[in-house]
A protein has these predicted regions:
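Polybasic/polar functional segments that serve as interface/processing modules
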Residues: 1-114
Length: 114
């Protein structure tokens, strides 16, 4: 099962990728463009050119997980910009991003009252 823990390193690729790419192509992209070993356990997030889908790639020690989320309406409104090939996010920021939010602005509560 895919689990995102607070100790995980999360990298969001700045450039959009061709969504026909699978595990092997995305793992090579991690090595070549993001300068990170895809077997490191780091969680990698990629965006489609139209910003309607994202892919998450992670190695769990036994094999790769590749998950895709395609929005039924709208687009991912936030994506990192800049000269760097990737931007690191914290777990709560990644959760906001996966919900199509803006990790720089939208805050998720660390806990909520019951």
């Amino acid at each position: 099962m895919l689990q995102i823990t607070p100790q995980m390193r999360i990298l969001v690729a700045v450039e959009a990728v061709d969504f026909r790419k699978g595990i092997d192509s995305l793992a090579e992209l991690c090595r070549a463009k993001l300068n990170t070993d895809p077997f490191s356990g780091c969680l990698f997030v990629f965006r489609s050119r139209r910003a309607t889908s994202i892919k998450v790639l992670v190695y769990d020690g036994q094999g790769f997980w590749l998950a895709t989320k395609r929005l039924s309406k709208g687009r991912f409104r936030w994506w990192p910009q800049g000269e760097e090939p990737a931007r690191a996010l914290r777990v709560h920021q990644a959760q906001v991003l996966l919900a199509a939010g803006n990790p720089d602005i939208d805050a998720t509560p660390v806990w909520r009252p019951i």
